[in-house]
């Protein structure tokens, strides 16, 4: 089994090494791995829809493991506004900076949790002034996350909030869609998606040894991404490596 998987990994690497893998190509690769290559949909064990769902699951899992897509957004704070919606593609806030109106230097704002703010000052919600911290909360209708500033700015202390955040890529749907929002520098890591999905299918079919082999290949791909792509969260995908990282703290 190990020899077969190594040979297969090499073949797939050659096929992905020169160009981006589209959704259609990923599905074809997975069908080869799990021996579901009939050209007739009537004889395929897994529909294109099934494979697309698993590929999107893999994309989310890998992105949760390695925050490789990041961007920055900004907004101008208002004295009358306590919370501001965060982008819908936000995975996690990485850094927040504040440039007070009229100032020339941007200040980094440390994060505080809601419980940490309460422990620090039970009346924190009524405090106003120049922001020194930010906090994240879930919007009351559970559709988006929101950012708040502490203390809340007044007219004399408004400014521009700069948010660097990790992006959750769009799900793939069209056959020509490319993983990870089409980022060209992530092309070498597309193979991890087909390895992950092949492992999931082998697991579903009860082929534990083959599933483990594919998960090890996917895990190796994730580890390469971690080594090469910079800042990482304290998170380990249980499906690939068998453990989940945790972190804790007080008065954050």
Language-model segments: residues:
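N-terminal hydrophobic targeting signals that begin at the initiator methionine
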Residues: 1-2, 22
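Sec-dependent signal peptide recognition
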Residues: 2-10
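Exposed boundary/loop context
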Residues: 10-13, 95
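Sec/Tat signal peptide C-region and signal peptidase I cleavage site
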Residues: 13-20
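Glycine-enriched, solvent-exposed interface loops adjoining structured elements
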Residues: 20-252
